[in-house]
């Protein structure tokens, strides 16, 4: 689970940015922007996309419950198409991408409304628009991994060179209400495809399952856990989506569902594994009161 904070040399500091909690049914988000009008744009888009998804699930209830890849990628609604592509790429059900996909739609709506910075945290699945060309600085996203040894840490993510929306998504088998068939403390994915980041985080968390450690020494537990971490990371490293459909915003790089795993982190207890391009670790004040959750 992660939580956002931000630094910005342009003067739009964390104190000046607006942070608002919003809940609609199961969707519980934290929205960050420089102006309240962009917050409203995100809320409207969340309601719109939830309605599209609910109508589709009403017509085909199995879509909302299956844990397996969806065999046919629908052309519309777009939220369902993107969720299906992401779930299929990760080898799991399409609902594994719901939080990240909704977050990415909300951020795209904020950008269309004129936002120069936008962030939506949907229960640890975060979509971000933070380009350097808009005067933005680095963003610090904290890590909350329950009772693991990795406390008061975060990632310092530099502003993007391109005007894109990217994802930082987290799954946990020990923290939060989301479904996980593993018991990792935190499985974190970085990707320019937010839906893929969400599904891949779920798949990575599922891939780490440890049991029967009662009779092992501490050294044996550590060695076994590290091997399981490495195995799980190897299972997800080649996930990718290649989508040729023109993006709905008319600006494909901004809000594309296409992407690969740019980086991944898996944490269990005092053990950690990292692959790919992962931002710098920094000390962070990870406050429970600002982590996105039901109230």
Predicted features and spans:
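A structural signal for small-residue-enriched, beta-sheet-centric alpha/beta enzyme cores
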Residues: 14-36, 140-295
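Ligand-binding beta-strand-loop-alpha-helix segment within the catalytic cores
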Residues: 74-97, 106-115
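Short acidic-hydrophobic catalytic motif
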Residues: 2, 44, 188
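RNase III-family endoribonuclease catalytic core
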Residues: 102-139
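Short amphipathic alpha-helical segments
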Residues: 38-45, 49, 98, 102, ...
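General beta-strand structural signal in soluble alpha/beta enzymes
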Residues: 93-99, 116-122, 128, 143, ...
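Short, Gly/Pro- and small/polar-rich lid/capping loops
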Residues: 1-9
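N-terminal low-complexity or amphipathic/hydrophobic leaders
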Residues: 13, 21-84
């Amino acid at each position: 689970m992660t939580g956002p904070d931000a630094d910005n040399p342009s003067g739009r500091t964390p104190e000046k940015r607006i942070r608002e909690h919003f809940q609609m049914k199961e969707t519980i988000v934290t929205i960050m922007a420089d102006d309240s009008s962009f917050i409203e744009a995100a809320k409207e888009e969340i309601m719109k996309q939830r309605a599209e998804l609910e109508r589709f699930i009403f017509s085909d209830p199995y879509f909302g419950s299956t844990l397996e890849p969806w065999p046919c990628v629908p052309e519309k609604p777009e939220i369902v198409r993107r969720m299906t592509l992401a779930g299929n790429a990760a080898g799991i059900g399409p609902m594994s991408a719901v939080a990240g996909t909704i977050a990415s739609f909300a951020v795209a709506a904020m950008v269309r409304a004129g936002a120069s910075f936008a962030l939506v945290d949907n229960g640890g699945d975060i979509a971000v628009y933070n380009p350097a060309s808009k005067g933005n600085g680095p963003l610090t996203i904290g890590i909350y991994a329950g009772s693991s040894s990795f406390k008061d840490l975060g990632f310092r993510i530099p502003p993007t060179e391109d005007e894109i929306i990217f994802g930082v998504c987290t799954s946990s088998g020990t923290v939060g209400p989301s479904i996980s068939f593993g018991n990792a403390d935190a499985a974190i994915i970085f990707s320019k495809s937010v839906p893929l980041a969400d599904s891949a985080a779920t798949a990575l968390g599922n891939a780490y399952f440890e049991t029967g450690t009662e009779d092992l020494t501490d050294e044996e537990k550590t060695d076994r856990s590290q091997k399981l971490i490495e195995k799980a990371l190897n299972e997800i490293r080649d996930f990718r989506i290649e989508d040729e459909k023109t993006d709905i915003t008319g600006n494909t790089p901004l809000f594309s569902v296409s992407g690969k795993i740019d980086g991944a982190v898996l944490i269990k207890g005092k053990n950690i594994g990292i692959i790919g391009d992962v931002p710098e670790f920094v000390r962070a004040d990870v406050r429970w009161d600002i982590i996105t959750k039901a109230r």
